């Protein structure tokens, strides 16, 4: 399971020009589910995301987590994070999990996050979305439950 985590001042998800989710200060999490991922991958990644100290303290150091700042989380499914571009010019998505299983793990991630963070919102699974954000920093982190990077 892979995540791109961005520290944001705000983020908005639209589907068919309609706002379906928006957050203020917090994290935008793009989540990609890989074949073979299970609930332990989702739980590991969620623990990392929630406790990732990417928010500044009084001295300007990245020393605070999402919980510490009472920040909000927006989770967006993105199977293209599993794209393999090593051969040719067209990405291969063969390592991405099938939609039915992905939706189960995506929903699990969101449900578990909702139990620990007061404001958790999400995009619409498998929808074509327009995501707008105001990066804070910018600060962008890449996470992988297989600890590949």
Curated annotation (Swiss-Prot):
Assigned keywords, A-Z: Cytoplasm, Hydrolase, RNA-binding, tRNA-binding
A Pfam family matched in the record: Tyr_Deacylase
EC category: hydrolase
GO molecular function: D-tyrosyl-tRNA(Tyr) deacylase activity; Gly-tRNA(Ala) deacylase activity; Ser(Gly)-tRNA(Ala) hydrolase activity; tRNA binding
Compartments, record wording: Cytoplasm
Gene3D superfamilies: D-tyrosyl-tRNA(Tyr) deacylase (3.50.80.10)
One Gene Ontology biological process: D-amino acid catabolic process
A single Gene Ontology CC term: cytoplasm
Gly-cisPro motif, important for rejection of L-amino acids (motif): residue ranges: 137-138
Family, similarity comment: Belongs to the DTD family.
Assembly, per entry: Homodimer.
Function as written in the Swiss-Prot or TrEMBL entry: An aminoacyl-tRNA editing enzyme that deacylates mischarged D-aminoacyl-tRNAs. Also deacylates mischarged glycyl-tRNA(Ala), protecting cells against glycine mischarging by AlaRS. Acts via tRNA-based rather than protein-based catalysis; rejects L-amino acids rather than detecting D-amino acids in the active site. By recycling D-aminoacyl-tRNA to D-amino acids and free tRNA molecules, this enzyme counteracts the toxicity associated with the formation of D-aminoacyl-tRNA entities in vivo and helps enforce protein L-homochirality.
Comment text on domains: A Gly-cisPro motif from one monomer fits into the active site of the other monomer to allow specific chiral rejection of L-amino acids.
Protein name: D-aminoacyl-tRNA deacylase
Organism lineage: Bacteria, Pseudomonadati, Thermodesulfobacteriota, Syntrophia, Syntrophales
């Amino acid at each position: 399971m892979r995540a791109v985590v961005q520290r944001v001042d705000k983020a908005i998800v639209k589907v068919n020009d309609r706002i379906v989710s928006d957050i203020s200060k917090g994290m935008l999490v793009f989540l990609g589910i890989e074949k073979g991922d299970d609930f332990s991958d989702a739980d590991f990644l969620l623990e990392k995301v929630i406790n990732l100290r990417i928010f500044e303290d009084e001295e300007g150091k990245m020393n605070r987590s999402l919980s510490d700042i009472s920040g909000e989380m927006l989770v967006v499914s993105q199977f293209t994070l599993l794209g393999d571009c090593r051969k040719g010019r067209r990405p291969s998505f063969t390592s991405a999990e099938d939609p039915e299983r992905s939706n189960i793990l995506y929903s699990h991630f969101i449900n578990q996050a909702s139990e620990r963070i007061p404001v958790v919102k999400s995009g619409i699974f498998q929808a074509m979305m327009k995501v707008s954000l105001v990066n804070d920093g910018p600060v962008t982190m890449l996470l992988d439950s297989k600890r590949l990077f």
